Amino acid sequence: MNPNYLDFEQPIADLEAKIQELRTASAGPSVNVDTEVRALENKLRLRTAQIFRNLSAWQISQLARHPRRPYTLDYISVVCDEFQELAGDRTLADDKAIVGGLARIGHRPVMLIGHQKGRDNKERLMRNFGMPKPEGYRKALRLMKLAERFGLPLLTFIDTMGAWPGIDAEERNQSEAIATNLIEMAELKIPVICTVIGEGGSGGALAIGIGDRTLMLEYSTYSVITPEGCASILWKDAAKASDAAEQLNLTARRLKEFGLIDKVIREPIGGAHRNPQQMANRLKAVLLNELEALDKVPLVTLLNQRHKRLRTYGAYENH
């Protein structure tokens, strides 16, 4: 099976292969298979729509991790008319799992920060599989405070399995770096829009996920733990990940129903990786609309609403 297809997409892969075979066969001048190709293309559209209308939480989790899914830098190349990356936390290093910088979207100057994964093994290692270390979150915080200083709206793109759990990260106080970002983002005196574009994993996602609007792409996920991690803890069996995915309620639709996010951004049929350009243009339009709406909210009201929405997530009681 083509590695760009997931298991549940096998019927789609088969139809696309048949269409390609017919097109190859019709390369000669005496062969005309246009009618057959059109019939198969229509069948393909209907079958794809049917499959993607009935996706399970586990299947959506797989789509959120698809190796061809657009990452932060892919969206930046389309959404932003200009982008100047800024590097380093000014303390230790430049964590490549977090990218960020000054950007312009249309006429709007913004600060943009996001997780970044890799396409091949070399880049995955360089990006640490999109799992930031403390210096990544401290770089993000530096850019957030820079945005606040210059009155720039902050946009974040979330796509990580979670924060890096290695000993080196713990030695540099990973939990403190995440906690500091949560505190600081809650008080930023600028509009903040957070968008989950792939995986939203635990505190590693939340460390750039506190804002005035939380958006999710249709086939993204947001959860305290991966389905495999949850299954390993609850049932001592990672093979039960599909059951865990259902119990975690990690899909955009479910989180919207719970009132934990503000908007679900529809993806092209088949997922964002099937038409990255269309997905990026759709995301750009939504972000510009949300920025325009937040422009009309006074700063005091903005902060009060941000604090109120954080309190609706739940409360901790010490008995």
Swiss-Prot record:
Assembly and interaction partners = Acetyl-CoA carboxylase is a heterohexamer composed of biotin carboxyl carrier protein (AccB), biotin carboxylase (AccC) and two subunits each of ACCase subunit alpha (AccA) and ACCase subunit beta (AccD).
GO terms assigned for molecular function: acetyl-CoA carboxylase activity; ATP binding; carboxyl- or carbamoyltransferase activity
Q: Which InterPro entries match?
A: Acetyl_CoA_COase_a_su, ClpP/crotonase-like_dom_sf, COA_CT_C
Q: Which GO terms describe its biological process?
A: fatty acid biosynthetic process; malonyl-CoA biosynthetic process
Read off the PANTHER family from this record. ACETYL-COENZYME A CARBOXYLASE CARBOXYL TRANSFERASE SUBUNIT ALPHA, ACETYL-COENZYME A CARBOXYLASE CARBOXYL TRANSFERASE SUBUNIT ALPHA, CHLOROPLASTIC
The protein's role, per its UniProt record: Component of the acetyl coenzyme A carboxylase (ACC) complex. First, biotin carboxylase catalyzes the carboxylation of biotin on its carrier protein (BCCP) and then the CO(2) group is transferred by the carboxyltransferase to acetyl-CoA to form malonyl-CoA.
Name of the molecule in the record: Acetyl-coenzyme A carboxylase carboxyl transferase subunit alpha
Q: Which reaction does it catalyse?
A: N(6)-carboxybiotinyl-L-lysyl-[protein] + acetyl-CoA = N(6)-biotinyl-L-lysyl-[protein] + malonyl-CoA
The entry's family comment says:
Belongs to the AccA family.
Could you state one GO cellular component term attached to this entry? acetyl-CoA carboxylase complex
Q: What is its EC number?
A: 2.1.3.15
Q: Which organism is it from?
A: Xylella fastidiosa (strain M12)
Q: Which compartments does it reside in? A: Cytoplasm
Q: Which Pfam families match?
A: ACCA
Identify the gene encoding this protein: accA
Keyword ATP-binding tagged: yes
Q: In which pathway does it act?
A: Lipid metabolism; malonyl-CoA biosynthesis; malonyl-CoA from acetyl-CoA: step 1/1
| Domain spans labelled CoA carboxyltransferase C-terminal | 32-293
Tell me the SUPFAM superfamilies matching this sequence.
Answer: ClpP/crotonase (SSF52096)
Keywords (alphabetical) are: ATP-binding, Cytoplasm, Fatty acid biosynthesis, Fatty acid metabolism, Lipid biosynthesis, Lipid metabolism, Nucleotide-binding, Transferase
